[in-house]
Regions:
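Conserved catalytic-core segment of nucleotide-activated headgroup transferases in glycan assembly
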Residues: 172-173, 181-235, 244
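A short, active-site helix/loop in glycosyltransferases that binds the activated sugar's phosphate group
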Residues: 120-161
Length: 357
């Protein structure tokens, strides 16, 4: 059996960190390999609740002291989840010359390093410095945009020869219910963290404009909204506001018919876990026409890609006037969600890293 290490900084409890946990869970559940979660420093208690009991966590690889450094040398493949850290992709990081730590490892003892770019891809241009050490270096990108950027821009010329593949986030769909709770109204909403970048300021005006036409036919339900908008949203009688993750996501999605992913128009969403979960539950997706949303939404098929408030308005009107399309698009979402289930993703990963059982 081979051991697959998953290394990251695990400082937060966001989508990137949850991705690490679900990937480890999937390796444990669906393959003959052994996953090992390797933390630069430590792992927040909140993250541990996402972990299978059988998955082992090793803290303090580098910080505050390299107590468990040797665990790096015991893996057959090391997957580095590069969230927003620009240092992991440099040889300086692994040889203790970055601002993050001063620990110099013998990188030659790591036979394979697979770098997964989940939030930014530009640091991958430095991977040739690691590859020159005789390491088998491979690249995973979370979306098509990142993948194509490496192939097109001159700054990636030194790493373009390295094996690379698109790998979406693994989504555990086992608890997702495909049957919506009955309602005589169309329920529109979304769940996410309450960050302003995840909820465009124009959402409020969109709701008001749609309500002028369909107030008696729609219920809005948002789990996780910015403080900036809460006061005004609470004034609208057909809007429900919930705290972030106040109820389990699968349960929440049973009461959502259309998933509204109107994040800030300035935001390039890499690949949305909340959109993926909504797809698995059978929701049409209305999302901004940017970033990884283009990988998840086929315009006019399982939802709509929208460039501004006007196109979000038009998409909602289209579905309200042709309600049969909500079911049709929702069924397409379920079909496409099969390509990012945890089992599908982990088998794709294992094939790419090419380890022997």
């Amino acid at each position: 059996l081979s051991t697959i290490g998953i290394f990251s900084k695990f400082e937060m409890c966001g989508g990137s960190e949850i991705r690490c946990l679900e990937l480890a869970n999937a390796i444990d559940r669906y393959t003959d390999h052994t996953p090992l979660l390797l933390c630069e420093k430590g792992m927040p208690d909140k993250l541990l609740s996402y972990k299978n009991d059988e998955v082992k966590v090793v803290e303090n690889i580098f910080l505050p002291e390299p107590i468990n450094l040797k665990q790096l040398y015991g893996v057959d493949s090391l997957i580095i989840i590069n969230t927003d850290c620009k240092d992991f992709s440099t040889l300086d990081y692994w040889e203790g010359r970055s601002a993050r730590h001063t620990v110099n490892i013998d990188i030659s003892k790591i036979s394979q390093m697979v770098f997964l770019y989940n939030f930014i891809v530009s640091p991958s241009r430095h991977l040739h410095t690691i590859s020159k050490k005789g390491i088998d270096v491979r690249i995973l990108t979370t979306n098509t945009r990142f993948f194509e950027e490496i192939g097109k821009q001159d700054r990636y010329e030194m790493v373009r020869h390295l094996p690379r593949m698109i790998l979406n986030s693994p989504i555990n769909t086992k608890e997702v219910c495909l049957i919506k709770n009955a309602s005589n109204k169309i329920r529109i909403g979304r769940h996410s963290i309450g960050s302003e970048s995840k909820f465009d300021v124009e959402n409020l005006n969109l709701i008001k404009e749609i309500n002028k036409r369909y107030e008696n036919d729609i219920e809005w339900d948002f789990m996780g909204v910015p403080r900036r908008d809460k006061k005004e949203l609470k004034k609208i009688k057909n809007v429900t506001i919930r705290d972030t993750f106040s109820i389990p996501v699968p349960k929440y999605l049973q009461d959502i018919d259309i998933f509204l992913f109107f994040v800030s128009l300035k935001r390039e969403e890499p690949w949305s876990r909340s959109v993926a979960e909504a797809m698995a539950s059978g929701c049409p997706i209305l999302a901004t026409d940017k970033g990884g949303n283009k990988d998840q939404v086929i315009n006019g098929n399982n939802g709509f890609l929208c460039k501004n408030k006007k196109s979000f308005y038009e998409a909602i009107v289209s579905l309200m006037e042709h309600k049969e399309r909500i079911k049709e698009m929702g069924e397409n979402s379920i079909l496409y969600s099969k390509f990012f289930t945890s089992e599908y993703i982990v088998n794709k990963l294992v094939t790419f890293i090419d380890l022997k059982s």
